[in-house]
Amino acid sequence: MTTPSKSPAENFRPANKRGAARLAAVQALYQMDVAGTGLLETTAEYEAFRLGKEIDGDLYREADAQWFRAILSGVIENQTFIDPVIRQSLTEDWPLSRLDSTLRAILRAGVYELSKRSDVPVPVVVSEYIDIAKAFYGEEEEPKLVNAVLDRVARRMRGEGKGKDPS
């Protein structure tokens, strides 16, 4: 696996406020995982200092703060459900702990939306999180992994996806 880019904002220009909220949620989940910060502290920091702000010369697009909060709190509240879903969608010899923190954050946010936000179409969720993976990793293997995992989850959860359900 490759090392994620330090500045995904350079590579990712979301077309809408929800796309910006998804990217910010992935970044916040990463921060919480690596730094051990809590949900309330991280949410407050992002809303006050990051969403729609300029940081180190990068202008972060204005994000839908409500969508950001929903993804972030939804992942945290449902992580005991989400992580096994991701694990089941990986190959047998690939434990969740083997994924780097950025990739785990992307998959957790995507699985949250697929499992708990049926109002969002599957192609939108999958496409948005593939784009986020590309912002961090370029055209490496990680965006393909995000596509495969989210497609498997979509077929299992919603009966939708690109491939045929193997069951």
UniProtKB/Swiss-Prot annotation:
GO BP of this protein: DNA-templated transcription termination; transcription antitermination
This protein's record includes keyword DNA-binding: no
UniProt GO MF annotations: RNA binding
GO CC terms of this entry: cytosol
Superkingdom per UniProt: Bacteria
Pfam family, one: NusB
Family: Belongs to the NusB family.
PANTHER family: ANTITERMINATION NUSB DOMAIN-CONTAINING PROTEIN, N UTILIZATION SUBSTANCE PROTEIN B-RELATED
Function: Involved in transcription antitermination. Required for transcription of ribosomal RNA (rRNA) genes. Binds specifically to the boxA antiterminator sequence of the ribosomal RNA (rrn) operons.
Protein name: Transcription antitermination protein NusB
